[in-house]
Amino acid sequence: MKYILVTGGVISGVGKGVIASSFGTLLKSCGLDVTSIKIDPYINIDAGTFSPYEHGEVYVLDDGAEVDLDLGNYERFLDVTLHRDNNITTGKIYKLVIEKERTGEYLGKTVQVVPHITDAIQEWVERVAQTPVQGSSKPQVCIVELGGTIGDIEGMPFVEAFRQFQFRVKRENFCLAHVSLVPLPKATGEPKTKPTQSSVRELRGCGLSPDLIVCRSEKPIGLEVKEKISNFCHVGPDQVICIHDLNSIYHVPLLMEQNGVIEYLNERLQLNIDMSKRTKCLQQWRDLARRTETVRREVCIAVVGKYTKFTDSYASVVKALQHAALAVNRKLELVFIESCLLEEETLHSEPSKYHKEWQKLCDSHGILVPGGFGSRGMEGKIRACQWARENQKPLLGICLGLQAAVIEFARNKLGLKDANTTEIDPNTANALVIDMPEHHTGQLGGTMRLGKRITVFSDGPSVIRQLYGNPKSVQERHRHRYEVNPKYVHLLEEQGMRFVGTDVDKTRMEIIELSGHPYFVATQYHPEYLSRPLKPSPPFLGLILASVDRLNQYIQRGCRLSPRQLSDASSDEEDSVVGLAGATKSLSSLKIPITPTNGISKSCNGSISTSDSEGACGGVDPTNGHK
């Protein structure tokens, strides 16, 4: 087993996750099986109770683990399935050691950070490194990312553990890559290497010497700066890798390859890579990177959320939208709308913000209402669902988005004006959304319906089922504590809301569709967690297709995208969507009202453009493996 440890210096958020994932992508392109471990030096057991504003999105794995969003990067980059033990926290390690002490495994010894905590860390890494993450084959390389920066007091036990670990596994099996910031002050206009020198000096003071120094910078770094870092940090020039800010993170593995990373790792770790038998993985990366640069036509999607001030709160949602947009040859234009600003209260308190946010919503080509918790902004989500339903605007609701759509429908189609969720109003007379008793234990951490579960499709035609490839059931990841009240299902269906997916017991509603609407779909599960660049999530793909008036064409072709067209850059002069040529019927024949009551133009002014997305070494599968 080979190990690559990725550490960071100077500042956090310097890009260790992308660098670590890129190492894995390069090695996987050489035919090696790769796994990843993320170490978070906080005392929390997991990320389940984190505020989205503080830590970003909580990513959910197949086994129900709530983990750091970097594990989502690993899964998307490498197209693997990770497990709860692939995320190590200080809380998990201390809990493990304390439990061993309580059962007498330390035979009455004084339990200390060294050796007990450090030994537990090393044993955990060795055990998880042997766990298969793709098929049944054991990984050959394990990439470990240590969160935070060198010098943080929280991370010192882990640094000491890896100081010992390098001797435990021998030098030829251990490589350390240190990611450091090279700032470019405007006052001087030249890169400064002192922060990197200090960071490497501190790392060496802990007993670890970097084999590779990855320099992150705003602009490309000149050869003289690279040589200076080489001289003062005691590494060869070929061991200094310069990664500047790029238009797309698709380019990061390619830039690392150009810097000779594969050749260095092959020699340093004795990987015995046959360079003449490289797989087509990196060629797929090059194709994807080229397409992100050449696609010009835009699709504008409004994300009506509660945590829009910090876009990492919706990291997987954004990536899933990017994957779907790229699949249909569109550049994604994202507009983040704070849901509370759509509420009537804002009209009276801040009318300018109210009208501005509603203008953004009306100008978009499609709407996405993501998940969330709590009462703040819920009425804004409900109003967004109402506008999309009444104005034939394509909409995808996720988790809380489904619940908002159901409540809105009950209020305005069933006449139940007090319809609500017990999360917000426990005493409501018409509880359309209720909590699940078995998941309501009084605690918050780890008490939700989590992980991959089966959703069974109902009989009869369904747009979302066709998008998945017409299977009888699919498996998707969940994270929720509330569900649609089954007592109201028949009343909702009588008015045109179709529950086309349920759990295996047919008691929990998983998917809704609206009859006579271009695309009004909502899911209780989170489809964004299983989206991949070459395998876009079907619900997201449906939203993008409907937003560009191509959904009917896609369905007529049997919901298939051409592998060649997915991998090759397409001309923006083409009027057809990638993989959809030959279809005859378009949603443009529908009379869709696009002008709201307050008269808004059909542009995406004031929106946020984004085109970064991950790549994977997998094949093309329009059903995204949901079989």
From Swiss-Prot:
Record-listed Phosphothreonine modification sites: 595
Phenotypic consequence of gene deletion: Larval lethal.
SUPFAM superfamilies in alphabetical order: Class I glutamine amidotransferase-like, P-loop containing nucleoside triphosphate hydrolases
Chain intervals for the UniProt region annotation (Disordered): 599-627
Tissue-by-tissue expression: In ovary, expressed in oocytes, follicle cells and nurse cells. Also expressed in larval and adult testis (at protein level). In larvae, expressed in lymph gland, salivary gland, regions of the midgut, testis, optical lobe and trachea. Isoform 1 is expressed in adult testis, ovary, accessory gland and head. Isoform 2 is weakly expressed in ovary.
The keyword Cell membrane is assigned to this record: no
Domain of life the protein comes from: Eukaryota
Glutamine amidotransferase type-1 domain segment(s): 300-554
Name of the top EC class for this enzyme: ligase
Presence of the UniProt keyword ATP-binding in the record: yes
EC number: 6.3.4.2
UniProt keyword list: ATP-binding, Cytoplasm, Glutamine amidotransferase, Ligase, Nucleotide-binding, Phosphoprotein, Pyrimidine biosynthesis
Entry's Gene Ontology BP terms: 'de novo' CTP biosynthetic process; CTP biosynthetic process; larval lymph gland hemopoiesis; pyrimidine nucleobase biosynthetic process
Catalytic activity of the protein: UTP + L-glutamine + ATP + H2O = CTP + L-glutamate + ADP + phosphate + 2 H(+)
Biased composition (Polar residues): 599-613
Active site: 399, 526, 528
GO cellular component, one term: cytosol
Pathway(s) of this molecule: Pyrimidine metabolism; CTP biosynthesis via de novo pathway; CTP from UDP: step 2/2
A GO molecular-function descriptor: identical protein binding
Annotated positions of the Phosphoserine modification: 567, 570-571, 588
Family (UniProt): Belongs to the CTP synthase family.
Function: Catalyzes the ATP-dependent amination of UTP to CTP with either L-glutamine or ammonia as the source of nitrogen. Constitutes the rate-limiting enzyme in the synthesis of cytosine nucleotides.
Name of the protein in question: CTP synthase
Gene this chain is encoded by: Ctps
